[in-house]
């Protein structure tokens, strides 16, 4: 594939291929020296206009483990602060001969716009409240590992929290339903999108009603940086109604798993320490992020005979 900008751009076979490739990358990451020459000679630019810890560092680690060069763009020390436009920034970096941009931006649609200005590949690391496709891949892979199968038929996924402002929710809904899961959204009406009736989901305003039948409980933080005032009465009341408390955790099925994309707001959506939950996959999500992003970079940047570099390593 040339770009990865949204889950909707993928077909089911593409999604499964990337998850299978992630298994190969995970095997590399278990080695004493987790590095292969698969993308030697390729240059990846980390173009982040929003703060990030997990996504940015996992992409940079993924590129290095595939032997690609990584250039980290710093907005605070760039010509953007001198008034340079996004287009001029992209075209300037393209002229340096880079092969891929990993882009995060506060505005929806920016990865598609950048693709009009460069012949390099574009990987969307989050655009506003729109899409976060690699997080959805991380989550699907982590669930697949936990349940031991590729099909999510019969799986009840409950996503709780600020759906309205969540790019993770949008990408995960697309990915989980593509693999056969039933998705239920739980949030106050003020934190649901206005066009929610068009989405392939069920909606509830009570976590207590659905928690006992949930197989995957996916908690989201309140995105205060994108929220208008007055969408919730206060953090305390929100946490009491929609947070994962000890009492709610005890009502989960024994086989149910708990997930969160991070960063967590402890005492708001998470009242329990993930370390105290035997069924938490939160740390696995972080660990799997590197393998997933290795698979994406390889799929986007490997051309022709370069596949042999992994075949020679015995992992492709």
Question: What residue spans do the PLM features occupy?
Answer:
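Short, structured coil segments at secondary-structure junctions
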Residues: 66, 97, 117-119, 179, ...
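Adenosine-phosphate binding glycine-rich loop
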Residues: 255-256, 261-316
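Phosphate/diphosphate ligand-binding glycine-rich loop within oxidoreductases
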Residues: 33, 37-144, 266
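Rossmann-like adenosine-cofactor binding region
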Residues: 196-273
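Positively charged, low-complexity intrinsically disordered leader regions
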Residues: 1-61, 311
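Glycine-rich phosphate/diphosphate-binding loop of Rossmann-like nucleotide-binding domains
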Residues: 49-61, 144-220
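Phosphate-coordination loops involved in phosphoryl transfer and adenosine-cofactor binding
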Residues: 39-44, 152-157, 255
């Amino acid at each position: 594939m040339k770009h990865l900008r949204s889950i909707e751009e993928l077909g089911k076979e593409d999604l499964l291929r990337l998850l299978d490739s992630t298994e190969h990358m995970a095997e590399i990451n278990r080695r004493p020296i987790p590095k292969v020459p698969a993308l030697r000679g390729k240059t990846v630019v980390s173009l982040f206009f929003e703060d990030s810890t997990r996504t940015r560092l996992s992409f940079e680690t993924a590129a290095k483990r595939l032997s690609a060069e990584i250039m980290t763009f710093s907005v605070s020390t760039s010509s953007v602060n001198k008034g340079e436009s996004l287009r001029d920034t992209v075209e300037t970096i393209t002229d340096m001969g880079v092969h891929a941009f990993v882009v995060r931006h506060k505005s929806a649609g920016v990865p598609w716009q950048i693709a009009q200005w460069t012949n390099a590949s574009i990987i969307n690391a989050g655009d506003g409240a729109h899409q976060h496709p690699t997080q959805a891949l991380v989550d699907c892979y982590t669930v697949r590992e936990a349940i031991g199968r590729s099909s999510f038929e019969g799986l009840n996924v409950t996503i709780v929290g600020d759906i309205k402002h969540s790019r993770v929710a949008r990408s995960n809904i697309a990915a989980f339903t593509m693999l056969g899961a039933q998705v239920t959204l739980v949030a106050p009406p003020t934190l649901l999108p206005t066009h929610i009736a068009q989405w392939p989901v069920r909606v509830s305003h009570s976590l207590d009603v659905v928690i006992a039948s949930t197989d995957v409980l996916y908690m989201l933080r309140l995105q205060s940086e994108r929220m208008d005032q007055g969408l919730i009465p206060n953090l305390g009341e929100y946490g009491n109604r929609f947070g994962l408390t000890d009492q709610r955790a005890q009502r989960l099925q024994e086989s149910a798993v708990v997930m969160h994309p991070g960063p967590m707001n402890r005492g708001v959506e998470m009242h329990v320490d993930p370390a105290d939950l035997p069924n938490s996959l939160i740390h696995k999500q972080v660990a799997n992020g590197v393998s997933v992003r290795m698979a994406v970079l390889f799929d986007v940047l490997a051309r022709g005979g370069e596949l042999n570099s992994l075949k020679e390593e015995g992992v492709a």
